[in-house]
Amino acid sequence: MTDDTTNSGGAPIVFDDWRTISFAVFLALVGYSVMVTVPVLSTALVHSLSFSAEQVGRVWGNDMLGFSVGAIIAALSVASVNRRHLVLGGIVFSMGANALCMYMVDYESMMWLRFAAGIGSGIFTGTAVATLGGTTNPVRAFNILLLGFSFSAAGELHLFPQLSLNGIYWFLIGSAAVCGLFIRWLPSRPLNQEEKELQHELEDRSEDWNVPVILPIFCLVAVCFTYINIGGYFTYIELAALDEGISPDWVTPLLTWASFLALVGCLLALVCARFGLFRPLFVALLSMAVLVGMLSGGITNVNLAISLFAFMALWTFADVYQSSMMGYMDRSGSLVALLPSVQGFGQFVGPNIAASIIGNGLGYSIMFLVSGSMALVAMVIYGGIFFYMHTRKSVSLTGDTEAA
């Protein structure tokens, strides 16, 4: 389509147009709304529908499973299907499921409806992430996304406790509907070969990102483990704090203010870019494991604040590096579009593991230890990728020296 090959915004690559990036960021933020507000949504289900803590974990875990499935659909389709049609289909599906949640409130129905709503969100979020990954500078694009994430998460965490459960559903429906108004800002197809060659001339060359397809797949596995950690921690942090006797008047504002630390994570990512993508990521994942695990010894006002504030900063910090790494390794966008899928799958597995631990009477302490250990698994996987890439670079340099 000719409107996708030319760019009136002045950028040589259509994916670098400010309108494309702005819309993709907004689309992704709408899709991630449930993921970033799970603590508040969990409490809303307990108070409004009298669901148990275990049921809450399974309901929102099902939403994230649907989110994962939707992103897989996007990944299989973004290279061949008109992306605008794909996004519109996801928006309609998500809006319909959220609307039905207001009328079908029993546990079994809620499980299926949250799964369906997740599918719709996953489809348009996966397409948005693939679009950001297709920019010439994915680090900048994902930093913009996560800067927006810090403000949208703070706003939603502040607003949602003031709304009824149906009010939250109306908010999700309305924000998805707004996305449809700007659909023409989204390129309908990926770059052609000529555009890819131009983009290759413009992109960062600090690493050799021409890697076997298995490496971005390993990256996706690592992202999944990172989000198993996030899912277990973030779903139950508010309920665990309340169970320990922490005042709701302390916990709720803390969640809101902690979300602004996502901004700090983005700024740190910019500062640390000089150290490459791998080393800062290792530090972030190790720190996340410690911050989650330390709550296993008991929750106080002080360690809750430290854990939440630092965790939110490191969440976005790690996401910038994980997403950018995928963007450089996979220019087609098919694997990048799977990022929301593995994030959602991790957010499905994490709450369900946590729910099983709590359901078996092992308590929140064991849950925090298990969740924190998942970040260490991700760190080991990235360590293997780093070792392969830099061993390959050393072998290549040695070969060039001998040839000379």
What are these regions (language model features)?
Residues 69-105:
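Conserved MFS/SLC helix-loop-helix module at the cytosolic interface between two early adjacent transmembrane helices
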Residues 143-191:
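Helix-loop-helix hairpin linking two adjacent transmembrane segments in secondary transporters
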Residues 123-136, 316-330:
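Intracellular juxtamembrane helix-capping segments at the cytosolic ends
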Residues 70-83, 264-277, 358-359:
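Helix-to-loop junctions at the C-terminal end of transmembrane segments
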Residues 276-322:
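C-terminal transmembrane helical hairpin of 12-TM major facilitator-type secondary transporters
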Residues 329-364, 371:
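A late C-terminal transmembrane helix in Major Facilitator Superfamily
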Residues 113-147:
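Cytoplasmic helix-loop-helix junction between adjacent transmembrane helices
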Residues 38-39, 214-256, 260-263:
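Extracytoplasmic gate region of multi-pass secondary transporters
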